[in-house]
Amino acid sequence: MRVAVCQLNARDDRKANLAAAEVLLERAADGGADLAILPEYVDYLGPAADLPEPEPVDGEVGTFFAAAARRLGMWVVAGSFHEAGPDPEHTWNTSLVFDRAGSLAASYRKIHLYDVEIPGRVSYLESASVAPGVQPVVVDVEGLRVGLSICYDLRFPELYRRLASEGGAHLLVVPAAFMLHTGRDHWEVLLRARAIENQCFVAAAGQTGDHEPGRTCFGRSMVVDPWGMVLTQLPDGPGVAVADLDLDRLAAIRAELPSLANRRL
C-alpha cells in the first residue's frame, strides 16, 4: 500500500483551496499512491468572520472530493472541513474518507478540541465554534485498517490506543494544522511516539505557512513506520510525499516486541 501526505497552504478562498488540493491529489496519483491524506480544514483557513456557510457531508466540499477520488481511482482522506453542526453557533470539524469509486467510506468528527490560553502568546478556543465528536473511527482500506484522527487529537494517546487495540488499526492518519510554536518542539516527537507505542504506521498531513495574522502552521508532513522511523517528510511549502507501507515489517515488529499483547492495563 502506497500512501501520500499532501501539504497545503489553505487560505480564505474555498474554491482556490479546493483547486490547490486537487493539484496535490493529482500529484499523489501520479506518484502511484493508493491512499492520499490532506490536511485539517482543507476547505478554509482564515478569519472566522469570513467563514463560508458550513455544509453537510454531501455539500460542495464532499462532492468535490468524491469526484476527485473517483476520477483518480485513489482512496482519499479529505483532511477535514467545516461540517454544518448541531446548532447555528457550532460546526463539526469533520474528516471524510472516499474510496476509489468516490463512495463515502467513513467520516470522523474531531473529538479533542483545542482550547488554549497562553498569556502574551496564543489564545484559541475551538469549542466556542466547534462541537466535539464522540466516536472513534477505523475504516478498512482494502485490508489496511486505518484509524482516523485530527490535529489536537494527537496529544491524547488514549484515542490511538483504542484505534489500535480495539479497532485493529495498522495505519493512523493525522490531518492537521499544527501551529509553528508548538510544532517545532512537539510535532515529530508526538507522531513518532504514537507510532512506537501503538506499533502502527502514522501518516500526518499538515497545513503550512501563514494563513491569517498571528497564525502560522508548521507543515513538515510525514510518514512514520511502526518502529518510529520517519520514512518521508516534507520541507516548508505545499507538496506531496509518498511512502510504501510494508505490512510484513509491521507484523515482524509486533512479533519481535509484542508490547500490545503484553499490556496489563
Where are these regions (language model features)?
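Short, acidic/polar
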Residues: 15-27, 156-163
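A short C-terminal boundary segment appended to hydrolase-like catalytic domains
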Residues: 248-265
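Short polar catalytic/cofactor-binding loops
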Residues: 7-14
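Cys-nucleophile CN-hydrolase/nitrilase-fold catalytic domain and related Cys-dependent amidase chemistry
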Residues: 14, 23-101, 107, 116, ...
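Extreme N-terminal starter segment of soluble prokaryotic enzymes
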Residues: 1-4
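CN hydrolase (nitrilase-like) catalytic-core segments centered on the catalytic cysteine
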Residues: 57-78, 145, 154-241
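Active-site catalytic loop in hydrolytic enzyme cores
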Residues: 54, 86-166, 179-189, 256-259
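Short beta-strand scaffold segments in enzyme catalytic cores
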Residues: 78-80, 94-97, 137-139, 221-223, ...
